[in-house]
Amino acid sequence: MSNEVEQKKSIKTINDLPGISQTVINKLIEAGYSSLETLAVASPQDLSVAAGIPLSTAQKIIKEARDALDIRFKTALEVKKERMNVKKISTGSQALDGLLAGGIETRTMTEFFGEFGSGKTQLCHQLSVNVQLPPEKGGLSGKAVYIDTEGTFRWERIENMAKALGLDIDNVMNNIYYIRAINTDHQIAIVDDLQELVSKDPSIKLIVVDSVTSHFRAEYPGRENLAVRQQKLNKHLHQLTRLAEVYDIAVIITNQVMARPDMFYGDPTVAVGGHTLYHVPGIRIQLKKSRGNRRIARVVDAPHLPEGEVVFALTEEGIRDAEE
């Protein structure tokens, strides 16, 4: 038994997997499965198709990877200890951080949804800067990946925010991987390729998708396309969630809203994406415009956060607390 335990401990990379030929390992790497973590969370069917290997081989590889990483049933106490190790990124506003119990969490997908001008993209910019701060200042000393689907990323805004925090502007820019997604297939392919990037660069601690639904809405309009759209969107969101969980990364997605004509009381706006987006993100925050530069953030869904709302401000320097 001790020999078996020692063998598991000796498996550090996919090259150490027992009984797997170099040819198969090369196929796995080419298919984007370059780490034990990505193999452990893969499905046998997906791995078999992507790498061009028999289903039985895929099942064996996944089992070996899971055994090496000690993926098993855990006690509630173990889960509690893992939750205590979750890291957080400050938003720049103490009030908003308080609403989020300390900031944006790693290992979790957080959704910000709201109308145009409600502060979604501003928050994405600010978090891409703040993640680079040292932990004692609310960051993770990490890098960000920014997937822009609407062309709203502005380097000038990053520059202003970095300058306000006294950071070296060129260093901040250099620590943000930016890519413009031109359609849904490109957006999905980018996230597929992210597995390789984050496994090679463990300093990546934030992934932003702004916005996650824009291309899906444009390319799959009408009820006749709804099932296909939701299926693709669901798989896309789960890929992002896996990245968050496997690599201890914070994932931020933004989403638009639409009006519901059948609602005669309360807030008539709802987030785009239907039930798929109601259930996948771990934390859902609605943003609303208020007076001037003030914005309202409200917890819509989060298993560990109480319902509530706070006011914050969009300033020239970035996200800040609203002045009384």
Curated annotation (Swiss-Prot):
Superkingdom, natural source: Archaea
Record keyword ATP-binding present: yes
SUPFAM superfamilies documented for this protein: P-loop containing nucleoside triphosphate hydrolases, Rad51 N-terminal domain-like
SMART domains in the record: AAA
Gene3D superfamilies for the chain: 5' to 3' exonuclease, C-terminal subdomain (1.10.150.20), P-loop containing nucleotide triphosphate hydrolases (3.40.50.300)
Swiss-Prot/TrEMBL GO biological process terms: DNA recombination; DNA repair
Cleaved signal peptide residues: none
Record keywords, A-Z: ATP-binding, DNA damage, DNA recombination, DNA-binding, Nucleotide-binding
Keyword DNA damage: yes
CDD domains, per database record: archRadA
InterPro entries: AAA+_ATPase (IPR003593), DNA_recomb/repair_Rad51_C (IPR013632), DNA_recomb/repair_RadA (IPR011938), DNA_recomb/repair_RecA-like (IPR016467), DNA_repair_Rad51/TF_NusA_a-hlx (IPR010995), P-loop_NTPase (IPR027417), RecA_ATP-bd (IPR020588), RecA_monomer-monomer_interface (IPR020587)
An annotated Gene Ontology molecular function: ATP hydrolysis activity
Binding residues for ATP: G114, E115, F116, G117, S118, G119, K120, T121
Pfam families referenced in this protein's UniProt entry, alphabetically: HHH_5 (PF14520), Rad51 (PF08423)
Regions crossing the membrane: none
Functional description taken from the UniProt entry: Involved in DNA repair and in homologous recombination. Binds and assemble on single-stranded DNA to form a nucleoprotein filament. Hydrolyzes ATP in a ssDNA-dependent manner and promotes DNA strand exchange between homologous DNA molecules.
Family the UniProt entry places it in: Belongs to the eukaryotic RecA-like protein family.
Protein name listed in UniProt: DNA repair and recombination protein RadA
Organism per entry: Saccharolobus islandicus (strain L.S.2.15 / Lassen #1)
Gene field: radA
